[in-house]
């Protein structure tokens, strides 16, 4: 459980011969107990999932001669709206006590992405971001 909530995430993708990765869709299900504002839960999961996907595809802190190369978010790559795949969120009905939602979408996207990549390509990566291994995102679903 993440913050008292249970979450599952699946990535549907295809890998091209040149290591281009087309992410077709992201599907998450969350059981966060009693939901009083489903729109907020959807927004938190969608945003957290895309934030985590950006980190999994591109982001790392790099050092050169002992100095961090990223000074702020202007050189820390994030997905743009036109690059983002569809995100499907399913809220599991529950009468349990409410759990956390804020960061739950972010935590699972990396492992889900690596599992989908392994299933599609046969290559099992153990480090993120994917760009380190030569993979790059391709637009379009």
What are the language-model segments listed below?
Residues 1-141:
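Cofactor-binding beta-sheet edge motifs in enzyme active sites
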């Amino acid at each position: 459980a993440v913050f008292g909530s249970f979450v599952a995430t699946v990535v549907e993708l295809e890998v091209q011969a040149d290591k281009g990765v087309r992410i077709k869709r992201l599907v998450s299900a969350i059981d966060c107990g009693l939901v009083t504002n489903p729109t907020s839960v959807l927004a938190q999961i969608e945003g957290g999932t895309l934030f985590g996907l950006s980190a999994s595809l591109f982001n790392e802190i790099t050092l050169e001669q002992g100095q961090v190369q990223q000074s702020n978010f202007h050189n820390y790559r994030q997905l743009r709206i036109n690059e983002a795949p569809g995100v499907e969120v399913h809220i599991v009905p529950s009468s349990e006590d409410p759990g956390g939602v804020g960061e739950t979408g972010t935590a699972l996207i990396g492992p889900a992405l690596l599992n989908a990549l392994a299933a599609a390509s046969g290559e099992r990566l153990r480090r993120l971001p994917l760009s380190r291994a030569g993979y790059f995102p391709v637009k379009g679903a």
